[in-house]
Amino acid sequence: MFRSGFIHNTRFNFSKVTTKRLFSSSARPIHSLRIKSLTLGVCGFSAITGLALYNHRLIELDNKKQDISPNISIAVDSSISPFPTALISANQTNLNTDFQLLGYGVRSVTFVNFKVYGIGLYIANDDVNKTKKILSPNYLSTFGTENHSLRELLSDPEFSAQLISKLLEENVRFAVRISPVRNTDFNHLKDGLIKSILAHPESKENKEIVSNGLEELRNVFSGYRGSVPKNHVLWLEILKQGSLSISYENPVKNELTSMGQVKEPIISKLLFLQYLSGKKPLSEPLRKSCNDGFIGL
């Protein structure tokens, strides 16, 4: 349904790169990474999962196990700042725990290949072991399929929904970083979330509950008007028991604003099912990248 805006061919050869922390209020010294020289042909978004490019600084990342140092960042789209691979709650004060990057991608409108925002999906560090147990062969064998491959089950519309639902039921916490690639406003961000939730089949089966939850979501946005410039950030965090915390980051002023919470858990459930499962996920590159992240845990 969605197509990446990164379509190019290029070749790189490098041996040493440096990166720096972006979102710490007390930035640490720049670290150096030594990476063996390589020549890499890149074509399309899916081929650059393991490669970050920012201001001529390159990082080679293993697709199956990313470096989650707080000093490492990932290039999601050339028009916005890279995303950190680790979120430290002591520095990222809008978050309630520490997170590591699970996957990332770009949300696009297919019929015009119109990029909307870059998105990164994170998993709570404290919930990684729980997730590994849920996604273990013992649990996967209960699906009654001949093939218990985690990758194939995560790629299957029906089984992926069951797996993600199980993670959410077991209170595995996730966070999402949304960064518009062009200027927008709070109203468009709110409408996008509402449309995504209503597009999930379960919303029709739970109309009253979903309606109440969406009213909470509208109330969270009710005090926020006006523009959201490109490269600003909307944060979504699933709390225990399924509440959804929403906050806004202005990187120019280095300000974080807590907007509020949606208490009804079906809202966070349907939204994250849309990100991680089903026939038509909100961003196929994000879903594929997160599948790699789950497998690499």
UniProtKB/Swiss-Prot annotation:
Pfam families per the UniProt record, alphabetical: Chalcone_2 (PF16035)
Parts of the chain that traverse the membrane: none
Annotated GO CC locations: mitochondrion
Key words, A-Z: Mitochondrion, Transit peptide
Cell compartments where the protein resides: Mitochondrion
Transit peptide, start-end: 1-35
Family: Belongs to the AIM18/AIM46 family.
Protein name: Altered inheritance of mitochondria protein 18, mitochondrial
Source organism of the structure: Debaryomyces hansenii (strain ATCC 36239 / CBS 767 / BCRC 21394 / JCM 1990 / NBRC 0083 / IGC 2968)
